[in-house]
Amino acid sequence: MSERNDRKVYVGRVVSDKMDKTVTVLVETYKTHKLYGKRVKYSKKYKTHDENNSAKLGDIVKIQETRPLSATKRFRLVEIVEESVII
């Protein structure tokens, strides 16, 4: 039971929802440079399984690591934290 809690959980923004049951989530993290101490922003895109096709472009979502679902999908959608406002 504790191994489920060891899985990585990230919060990111949906940048693509064109695939069926899959969204691409951009996760931004900050790391401190060892020598200079400056915070540097890193970003990475993760393909995420969205069973109900509920996440839309621009939504802020929480994703969790899971077993490999396809050649590129290793995460699943946990919840939609904030829905995007389309003007």
Curated annotation (Swiss-Prot):
Keyword set, alphabetical order: Ribonucleoprotein, Ribosomal protein, RNA-binding, rRNA-binding
Lineage: superkingdom: Bacteria
Gene3D superfamilies found in the cross-reference section: Nucleic acid-binding proteins
One annotated Gene Ontology cellular component of this protein: cytosolic small ribosomal subunit
The UniProt record lists the keyword rRNA-binding: yes
Pfam families, A to Z: Ribosomal_S17
GO molecular function: rRNA binding; structural constituent of ribosome
Record-level GO BP terms: translation
InterPro entries documented for this protein: NA-bd_OB-fold, Ribosomal_uS17, Ribosomal_uS17_bact/chlr, Ribosomal_uS17_CS
Function summary: One of the primary rRNA binding proteins, it binds specifically to the 5'-end of 16S ribosomal RNA.
Family per similarity comment: Belongs to the universal ribosomal protein uS17 family.
Assembly mode: Part of the 30S ribosomal subunit.
Protein name stated in the entry: Small ribosomal subunit protein uS17
Organism annotation: Staphylococcus epidermidis (strain ATCC 35984 / DSM 28319 / BCRC 17069 / CCUG 31568 / BM 3577 / RP62A)
Higher taxonomy: Bacteria, Bacillati, Bacillota, Bacilli, Bacillales
Gene: rpsQ
